[in-house]
Amino acid sequence: MKHLILTSILAIGLSTALLAQDQLRLAGGDISLLPSYEQYNTPYKDQQGATISDLVTYAATTLHWNACRVRLFVDPCVTNPDNGKRQGEVQDLQYVAALGKRIKDAGMYFLLDFHYSDTWADPVKQTIPAGWQSLSEAQLLDTMYTYTRMCLRALVDAGATPDYVQIGNEISYGMLWRGTSKNTTDKVYPRDSYTKNPANWERFTNLLSNGARAVREVCPDAQIIIHIERTADATACVQYFGNLNHYNVDYDIIGLSYYPFWHGRLTTELPNTLKALHGSYPDKPIQIVETAYYNNYWPTSGISYDTRETYPATPAGQDAFLGDLVTKLQEYDYVNGLYYWFPEENGCGGATWNANTIVIDDWLNRGLFDPNNHKAYAGLYRIGAYAVTPASVEAVSTDSRDANYYTLLGVSMGADRAQLPAGLYIHQGKKVHITK
């Protein structure tokens, strides 16, 4: 879909404002834990207290989201003998395929986030999967390719073809470390030139390239994202992607995490990094693939920037942050994605607290639902303002003479509703969600 210009005319009397693919702006959330909450019948309600029967459909139709992100672990049961129920480590391939299909059926874009680990991968943990630990470096490179290819093939077959693929999660310091963060010798350092440790940079970029090769083969229309979290350090970000370019890593989009309490202020650190990256790599769009803000308890440690004076740790402060973030990102035409991390957080799970229905042990207090009454916070409704979808209902109107159904990309699917696959369509100027 790269640089695809949509030219389909939907019907007689159709009024369109069709956008080029590179004008698309994605907005949504990483909803990786939603099915686990649903499994324990956790209620989701709108601001007025009305029940939301399906949050994925609600996101597409009411929140105006056009994309969702889902993480994928290799074998989460290895580190979680209770089948990974606690702490959110449940996202194996079968789980992700089912959730990915729901996202696609709702008419949204699907961002797949490969962790290449059995557990959380982030700047301090890039633990090699248990089943891969005995592999030689040559075998590991091959497994990076075959595993990525196998997963993507399974998702395509399940009707959950990813539109965007992250090769790793927050891989600022590399990936697939042998050993712990303290003793591994596999790290790369984003502020350093590759010349300081060429062996590690070559290992790391070869892994990335093998993952990217699998994406190009199985999902040729998907765009590849390289995701880091050094957003407070513009110099490190520029150096890092310069190192990747030296090794000819194949990717399309720069992905950043932006949590203001770790990565700096909306008025300084974030714009400085966005401008520096665009100035150095003008051919690479940028997406904020993770963001969030506290709605309640403010941690007593682990915080780099105290932003409470501007944005209190309250639902109103969270809402104000999201409103300002959307406004700020709209200033940069080279930023084309915004994902809220874990918006579905809704207490420990279940309608009321019960030790048998615990999805997570601890509340992060960054979700977009009140964990006590399960009502949506105002911030839930902010994110969709960033979205711009080609041929969206906001840009399409048809008259009653056109009986055809159209995808959100303007493709006619015919007039026989019974023959349509599940998904979100435009029919006579309205969004219609069809289920099977």
Question: Predicted regions span which residues?
Answer:
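Hydrophobic faces of well-ordered beta-strands that scaffold small-molecule active sites
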Residues: 26-29, 66-70, 110-114, 163-167, ...
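C-terminal tail/sorting-segment detector
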Residues: 424-436
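Residue-level detector of functionally pivotal "anchor" positions at catalytic/ligand-binding pockets or at interdomain
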Residues: 388-409
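Aromatic-rich peripheral "rim/lid" segments of glycoside hydrolase catalytic domains that contact
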Residues: 182, 276, 283, 296-324, ...
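Substrate-binding cleft and catalytic face of glycoside hydrolase catalytic domains
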Residues: 59-223, 229
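Acidic-and-aromatic substrate-binding clefts and catalytic sites of carbohydrate-active enzymes
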Residues: 37-50, 75-81, 85-94, 172-175, ...
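Boundary/entry segment of secreted carbohydrate-active catalytic domains
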Residues: 21-58
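Glycoside hydrolase catalytic-domain groove-lining segments
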Residues: 53-59, 202, 217-224, 231-306, ...
